[in-house]
A protein has these predicted regions:
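Acidic donor-binding loop of glycosyltransferase active sites
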Residues: 274-284
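A nucleotide-sugar donor-handling region in carbohydrate enzymes
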Residues: 151-213
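C-terminal amphipathic helix plus adjacent low-complexity
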Residues: 342-392, 396
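Short hydrophobic beta-strand element within catalytic cores of glycosyltransferases
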Residues: 279-281, 297-306
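Active-site and donor-binding regions of nucleotide-sugar-utilizing enzymes
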Residues: 71-168, 173
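C-terminal "capping" alpha-helix adjacent to the active site of nucleotide-linked donor transferases
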Residues: 317-318, 326-343
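Donor-nucleotide binding loops and adjacent catalytic segments primarily
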Residues: 191-193, 201-275, 309
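Conserved N-terminal ligand/cofactor-binding loop architecture of enzyme catalytic domains
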Residues: 22-99
Length: 476
């Protein structure tokens, strides 16, 4: 059966769209896929909204990074901000909704939390019938990514999966796949050809400095400090689309072109990352995953509070990176690494062990091979999940009514709903139940006025039964 796949992203930075592109490329020429389309939803929104959402975020990163970290922490627990799309986002994404409905996808792959929440809201209102996968793009999972319904969540690492399982999510709906990156990062590279293309010498360590992401002043300081180092090295400085930075960098480097090679935007990052010795840059989810897939150690600079700090924690824990906390010592720290080839080799081995170059294939194969529907989470179960994940309430047992219960389709063995024990007892009074099993009947749900059930529970169960008259479930 050929299916239509829609990949939804949001161009806040480049990482979410890069993950989307990796997925689209993996889906190309699949015989079981009829059509693939990728939509950056911000391109369908009003210019003012797009500016606030994208530029406003990076303005906050530059001028009030503490506020970014505070906001991350406030939304860290699942469902901390609820599962509904805020009115501000709703009124600015009407064209997005229209585009999604018109395409009518069989499968949605969401690489940003906003389109995931939009799709979940459409599914809850029975305005869209599809299977949605959420593909997270940082090493830790943040609560904003979790919706009240999904088919599967793909996570960057096993600890994030274990965190959600410990919070109460069914483990059959969670996959530690890694973050999707272009397949080239995991392939062998023609090293002599790449070195010749960029005028690099074999046998001399190569620093790959992501200057555009680091920001102009910081990147210039890195190069200034490296100009004073005496260790053998050569550096490729990538300025991206920042023409002013490239001009300033060219001026700073001057005639020292044997050691410093200044580039603007380049599509050759997969090649450069596979021949480099150290990547110098920020620990974004995608850039970090690309470096790990290429087996490239990282020297981390200026992480954004929240997700980038969490990413750097993980990379340090894996032994694949060092982090620089002082702008004035980055040259010294890089010199220490260059002077210790054995340490660099250990870091390279750690990066290779951490990398997941096949993440895109895992996502695509799992979603195309899985024919089961969505998991639905009741409003009361969402509150229980939120409380279970709070770090400031350690080991506080849930009240009997708040304990989570999973409804499992007996024919497929897959979880279909997450409710509370109190809701299960209500349901048992009106549905046929026996031991640890129950039969959910759509006809009975039509009798809501006489059933006296929680209306939100009835609405959720109607979604569970949207395409079948009844469903036999076991309960755990």
């Amino acid at each position: 059966m050929e299916r239509k796949v829609m990949i939804l992203s949001a161009g806040v930075g480049s990482g979410h769209n890069s993950a989307a592109a990796a997925l689209q490329r993996n889906l190309a020429n699949r015989p079981d896929v009829s059509t693939v389309t990728t939509l950056d939803i911000l391109t369908t929104t009003p210019e003012f909204y797009r500016t606030v959402y994208d530029d406003g975020y990076f303005e906050m990163v530059a001028k009030a990074p503490w506020l970014v970290g505070w906001g991350y922490d406030q939304a860290d627990a699942p469902f901390q901000l609820g599962s509904r799309v805020p009115w501000w986002d709703q009124i600015n994404t009407t064209e997005t909704v229209t585009r999604i409905k018109e395409f009518s996808p069989d499968i949605v792959l969401a690489t940003h939390f906003l389109p995931a929440r939009i799709v979940a809201n459409l599914q809850s209102a029975q305005e869209l019938f599809t299977r949605m996968a959420i593909i997270t793009t940082d090493y830790d999972v943040q609560g904003l990514w979790i919706t009240n319904t999904f088919s599967r969540i793909f996570l960057a690492r096993e600890e994030s999966r274990q965190y959600l399982i410990a919070s109460g999510f069914p483990e059959d709906r969670l996959t530690a796949s890694g973050i999707p990156v272009r397949y080239e990062f995991g392939q062998q590279v023609d090293r002599p050809a790449v070195l010749a293309q960029f005028g690099l010498r074999d046998g001399v360590p190569i620093l790959l400095i992501s200057a555009g992401a680091a920001g102009g002043p910081y990147a210039l300081r890195i190069v200034q400090q490296m100009q004073a180092r005496t260790e053998p090295f050569q550096a490729v400085v990538v300025c991206g689309h920042n023409a002013d930075l490239k001009r300033d960098m060219d001026t700073l480097v001057g005639d020292d072109t044997d050691r410093f090679h200044v580039l603007g935007f380049t599509t050759a990052m997969p090649d450069l990352m596979r021949v480099a010795s150290i990547f110098v840059g920020k620990p974004g989810g995608l850039s970090s995953s690309e470096a790990m897939a290429a087996g490239l150690p990282m020297a981390l600079i200026n992480p954004i509070p929240g997700q980038e700090v969490r990413n750097s924690d993980y990379l340090l824990e894996q032994g694949a990176a060092v982090r620089n906390n002082y702008e004035t010592t980055i040259g010294w720290k890089l010199g220490e690494l260059l002077a210790d080839p054995a340490r660099l080799e250990r870091m390279r081995a750690a990066a290779q062990a951490t990398g997941r170059p096949g993440a895109a294939s895992t996502v695509v194969n799992d979603m195309l091979g899985d024919r089961d529907g969505q998991l639905w989470i009741s409003d009361k179960a969402q509150r229980s999940l939120r409380e279970a994940s709070h770090l400031d309430k350690p080991d506080r047992p849930a009240s009997p009514k708040q304990r989570l219960r999973t409804l499992i389709d007996t024919s497929s063995g897959r979880s279909v709903a997450l409710i509370t024990d109190g809701q299960l007892k209500e349901l048992s009074k009106v549905m046929w139940a026996s031991g640890t099993g129950m039969t959910l009947e759509r006809a009975r749900l039509r009798e809501i006025t006489t059933l006296q059930l929680d209306p939100t529970l009835v609405t959720m169960l109607r979604n569970v039964l949207a395409h079948r008259p009844d469903l036999k479930v076991s309960i755990t």
